[in-house]
Design a protein with these regions (language model features):
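Right-handed beta-helix
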Residues: 43-46, 50, 248-262
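Terminal edge beta-strands and adjacent linker/stalk segments
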Residues: 64-65, 168-172
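Glycine-rich, low-complexity segments
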Residues: 49-88, 176, 181-190, 194-198, ...
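Surface-exposed, low-hydrophobicity beta-strand/loop segments enriched in small/polar/acidic residues
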Residues: 9-14, 40, 69-75, 97-99, ...
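Acidic glycine-/aspartate-rich tracts in secreted/extracellular proteins
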Residues: 48-56, 106-111, 150-156, 173-181, ...
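Acidic, glycine-rich loop-and-strand cores that form catalytic or ligand-binding grooves
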Residues: 173-248
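Extracellular "spike/adhesin" assembly and maturation modules
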Residues: 1-74
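Glycine-rich strand-loop-strand elements at beta-sheet edges
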Residues: 84-86, 90, 94, 104-170, ...
Length: 285
């Protein structure tokens, strides 16, 4: 686009190099500003390009197309809202939502328990694994979609930790983490940790973190395995237990519980429970 540059333009009306228009002055002989096709073409194409770039077709009968186009161009892609879901339900998007980015975490597995011991023995369960993590973008079909939040694994004295369950939304599935295996009674043993939850259907699919091994070092030193951390809650798996007791529960969504620990001549213990999953939805215009 350009400012008026015909021979009768009012030179530097708005500052140096910023010509303007004049209606002329018969008393002084000043002519009114003449308009040429070049100027009108410039104005027409400048305005038309804004309207058409918004996807709106030019319509001679409408007088509001420029403001309609500006609103569409300025508002498109704007973050409208962030919603966090910790219980299953049906998704209702904010008015004006055209695109969503969904983050989902599966439920964490519970830590493995520990069995009863005799003198000279210890027992340490391994940590539960965290749920998988999925991120996906959707531009249609999301309004009214049902979703499921995965539950955390349960725990019981002297038993393997329970598995976490899957968190799902449309095509994505963030699998639950596996429960940790129960410890054995011995003077030295290693109980390998469980595997992280699977992740499918997203633009980003990341398996959960494995639970840590439960280890009996000697007849007097043992550690229950710590739980796996989820991708958005690092460090929130159930802590490792060095003393006799039930495993520590997970403290962040999708994380695994810690393993239980039984000292010498101790009773059976449970692992720590796994944490439930989560869905986060980012809504854009």
């Amino acid at each position: 686009m350009h400012r008026i540059d015909t021979s009768t333009a009012q030179v530097d009306k708005f500052g140096a190099g910023k010509n303007g228009f004049t209606g002329g002055n018969p008393q002084t002989g000043e002519l009114p500003t003449a308009l040429d096709a070049d100027f009108f073409d410039s104005v027409q194409e400048e305005i038309s390009s804004v309207i058409e770039s918004s996807g709106v077709a030019l319509d001679k009968s409408k007088k509001n197309q420029l403001v309609t186009a500006i609103k569409a161009l300025v508002s498109s892609g704007r973050l409208l809202n962030k919603k966090i879901f910790s219980s299953s339900g049906i998704y209702s998007p904010t008015t004006g939502t055209k695109l969503i980015i969904v983050e989902a975490i599966g439920g964490g597995g519970a830590g493995g328990g520990s069995v009863a011991t005799t003198s000279g023995q210890q027992s340490s369960g391994s940590g539960g694994a965290s749920g998988g993590y999925v991120m996906a973008t959707f531009t249609s079909g999301f309004a009214g979609a049902s979703y499921i939040i995965g539950s955390g694994g349960s725990a019981a004295n002297g038993n393997n930790g329970g598995n976490g369950s899957s968190t799902t939304f449309l095509t994505i599935n963030a699998g639950g983490g596996s429960g940790g295996p129960v410890g054995t009674a011995s003077a030295a043993s290693v109980i390998a940790g469980s595997f992280g939850g699977s992740a499918t259907g997203g633009d980003i699919n990341a398996a959960g973190s494995n639970g840590n091994s439960g280890i009996v070092y000697t007849a007097s030193v043992a550690l229950g395995g710590f739980g796996g951390s989820s991708k958005i809650y690092p460090g929130n798996g159930g802590a490792s237990r060095a003393s006799t007791g039930d495993g520590f529960p997970a403290t962040g969504y999708g994380c695994g519980g810690g393993g239980g620990n039984s000292g010498a001549s101790g009773g059976a213990r449970a692992g720590g429970i796994g944490a439930q999953g989560l869905i986060i939805i980012w809504e854009y215009s």
